[in-house]
Swiss-Prot record:
Enzyme kind, highest EC tier: transferase
Top-rank lineage group of the source organism: Bacteria
Record-stated family: Belongs to the ATP:guanido phosphotransferase family.
Source species taxonomy: Bacteria, Bacillati, Bacillota, Clostridia, Eubacteriales
Function: Catalyzes the specific phosphorylation of arginine residues in proteins.
Record's GO cellular component terms: extracellular space
UniProt entry keywords in alphabetical sequence: ATP-binding, Kinase, Nucleotide-binding, Transferase
Protein name per UniProt: Protein-arginine kinase
């Protein structure tokens, strides 16, 4: 079980994720490595991981060996893996305890990422930083005293740190405040985007808050900024909830319980409709309106109903109608237990 799925409380914040990117001194960037150079890189890095006792703690997945289905599974895990520019030579190390993931030859030579529940950016970064220090004792990174960590993508230059918070903002979304907030945050070097989309429309009310800048700020500055912004978003969402009129609250409660009834009894449902109703159900749990469910159940449902997840559990790829039926079955089983 991935750790973030089990939250500590009924938090608006679902999970925090940190990823750092590193390149090895004296080796070409990932995009221009040939096969022999990649094998040399792999031998060096895996040898290092064995020395510092990482390798035995991980499952090692090689995409070139035809294990794309396993990667599809993680693509649905709130974007644990998103970009595969070098699919043939991508190596994925998944910690057996779900504490961290390491990607070799993805965006850069090494990518280390960790996700945990709630607003826990500092704790997540601490885990990654400790692991990074162990690796750096054995491998010399590409580093410049003025520019910081050197990367093939200029957007990652500097700290080469990407921090993200996944947050549930149904009231801000329904009151059409998200677009205004997105534009304001962009001015502060922060991106706010929906993790689920249908065309140009946000779906599911789950948003990713992430840093844009990696250069000219320390790791601490980046994390502190993101935590501060997230706390402001939490406060704004709570204010929307607290300031509902009596009639608005009654309607919201009715919408929440209707959504729960539909999901517990549906036979066939598409992804967007399911995410819409699951957002209502999650809100119901957060507000204490729904007492016989946990956020763990809702989080699990949101992940398990994604197309790649359903296909991953099937022997062969299933058609759209069968996908809808299987999705409804997953939701019924998850929300009725």
């Amino acid at each position: 079980m991935v750790q973030w799925i089990s939250p500590l409380d009924n938090s608006i914040v679902i999970a925090s994720k940190v990823k750092i990117l590193r390149n090895i001194k004296g080796i070409k960037f990932t995009k221009i490595l040939n096969e022999d150079e990649f094998n040399d890189l792999l031998s060096m890095v895996l040898g290092c991981f064995k020395e510092i006792d990482i390798l035995d703690k991980c499952y090692v997945v090689k995409l070139k060996d035809g294990e794309e289905k396993i990667i599809d599974y993680y693509k649905e895990n709130f974007g644990l893996i998103k970009y595969f520019e070098n699919k043939d030579n991508l190596i994925f190390l998944m910690n057996k305890n779900g504490e961290f993931n390491i990607l070799l030859n993805e965006e850069e030579h090494i990518g280390i990422e960790c996700t945990n529940s709630g607003l826990s950016l500092r704790e997540v970064y601490s885990k990654i930083d400790n692991l990074d220090d162990l690796i750096e004792e054995k491998i010399h990174y590409s580093f410049d005293s003025e520019l910081g960590y050197l990367t093939s993508n200029i957007k990652n230059l500097g700290t080469a740190l990407r921090a993200k918070v996944f947050i549930h903002l149904p009231l801000l979304s329904s009151n059409n405040l998200i677009k205004i907030i997105k534009n304001a945050l962009k001015e502060e070097g922060i991106t706010l985007r929906s993790i689920y989309n249908s065309g140009n429309k946000d779906v599911g009310n789950i948003y990713e808050v992430s840093n844009i800048k990696t250069l000219g700020m320390s790791e601490k500055d980046i994390l502190d900024s993101l935590i501060s912004i997230t706390n402001k978003l939490i406060l704004r969402e709570k204010n929307q909830r607290d300031n509902l009129s009596k009639d608005e609250y009654i309607k919201l409660k009715d919408d929440i319980l209707r959504a729960l009834g539909i999901l517990r009894n549906t036979y066939s449902i598409d992804r967007d409709e399911a995410l819409k109703y699951l957002s209502y159900v999650r809100l119901g749990v957060e507000l204490g309106i729904i007492e016989d469910l946990t956020l763990k159940s809702v989080n699990s449902a949101m992940i398990e109903i994604q197309p790649d997840m359903i296909n991953n559990s099937s022997i062969k790829k299933i058609d759209i109608q069968s996908l809808k039926i299987e999705r409804a079955k997953i939701i019924r089983n998850t929300l009725n237990t």
